[in-house]
Curated annotation (Swiss-Prot):
Belongs to the MQO family. Signal peptide: none annotated. Its cofactor is FAD. Pathway: Carbohydrate metabolism; tricarboxylic acid cycle; oxaloacetate from (S)-malate (quinone route): step 1/1. GO terms for biological process: tricarboxylic acid cycle. SUPFAM superfamilies: FAD/NAD(P)-binding domain. Its EC number is 1.1.5.4. The lineage of its organism: Bacteria, Pseudomonadati, Pseudomonadota, Betaproteobacteria, Neisseriales. It holds the Pfam family Mqo. It catalyses: (S)-malate + a quinone = a quinol + oxaloacetate. This is Probable malate:quinone oxidoreductase. InterPro entries: FAD/NAD-bd_sf, MQO. It comes from the Bacteria. GO terms for molecular function: 2-hydroxyglutarate dehydrogenase activity; L-malate dehydrogenase (quinone) activity.
Amino acid sequence: MAEATDVVLVGGGIMSATLGVLLKELEPSWEITLIERLEDVALESSNAWNNAGTGHSALCELNYAPLGANGIIDPARALNIAEQFHVSRQFWATLVAEGKLEDNSFINAVPHMSLVMNEDHCSYLQKRYDAFKTQKLFENMEFSTDRNKISDWAPLMMRGRDENQPVAANYSAEGTDVDFGRLTRQMVKYLQGKGVKTEFNRHVEDIKRESDGAWVLKTADTRNPDGQLTLRTRFLFLGAGGGALTLLQKSGIPEGKGYGGFPVSGLFFRNSTPETAEQHNAKVYGQASVGAPPMSVPHLDTRNVDGKRHLMFGPYAGFRSNFLKQGSLMDLPLSIHMDNLYPMLCAGWANMPLTKYLLGELRKTKEERFASLLEYYPEANPDDWELITAGQRVQIIKKDSEKGGVLQFGTEIVAHADGSLAALLGASPGASTAVPLMIRLMHQCFPERAPSWEGRLKELVPGYGIKLNENPERADEIIAYTAKVLDI
């Protein structure tokens, strides 16, 4: 007998937690069930050590504003990402202020920096600063080529550096480090207190649609072969990170045809030595290598995890065919179907430089990887750093009318035409934009409910519907409010 519920959220990460809280705030009477394949929430991509913890607000990430063919830098994409992060930040602040999260320990003030180290990159960074400084959301950004000034911002990165090497940096004091694992756990704890049912160690075996439009999920208990659970729901969200593609394919919705995925794994060096970690207080992003994917931009970060400060450097791209860190090596081959084979072949052929780059990364020894760290931290001691494996990211491959198939970086909502099912595919900027992504998903799937939600949404997100960059006075009010509540 199927257990009926209004909403099923598949995946125990930041996306399901965010959508769950939004729905509980907007539709308190709806019954919600969250199912997770592992024994707890936030053990895959949302776990603190499976992502970089950057509150992506485009202050330091150079790939969000590349140099155009005309020599001009357009800040539009960077502004869009910054606006989205501020929506998330407002939502988190409201939940803290209303006592719905335990505290604000999941977010810490950590300055964001960009550091570049050759003449061309220094010229680019100057142009980027010139394009950004006139924008409200970037007005506090600083730029310098003065080595002493840069040393004040990031002493470890300048100590022992060649005096003749050109360097330039920008600095934004309002950057953040976010423990998305802790945030997810706090959100789910709140949901459980509101009656949301959580089912752990549940693997989705099958997804079918019944004649009345309801979705039926057959799940198995990963610890007990006889522990079957069947759920029946009118709305299904597939937010299982890299596993969402496989679930989307199981659903059989026409909107999911032609989608494929390319998994990329990440490695980081981590330093937990207190005396070293205390000397660096910034997330410092550089320029990606030629041919490198956007998620491979090198950065030396301050991380605050479970009340302790660490340093982390990376990522180093790798390849494993599983879609989740605790997934199966058969994930990629089993995801290839007749409807996505051609798009995947076309995307693969068009991205040979990426394939070459990944092969080169895979062949690197630990010493060769450490040499990259020395470019950013010249006096780094190899004995103080351990190499850790972060989470899997599945990049989207989709059909394209002109190219056959394209590899797409970013996130994408794929929803059934009637709004009864939605999946979130892709990666960066991911968790930082969870709130605007889930609000957009809700409007797409429940258009008839949206008007009745406006009032509460404006309480949850005080600047809802407003572009902060275009409303300076309101931006000052909201940014000051969220900074005070979140202690950032």
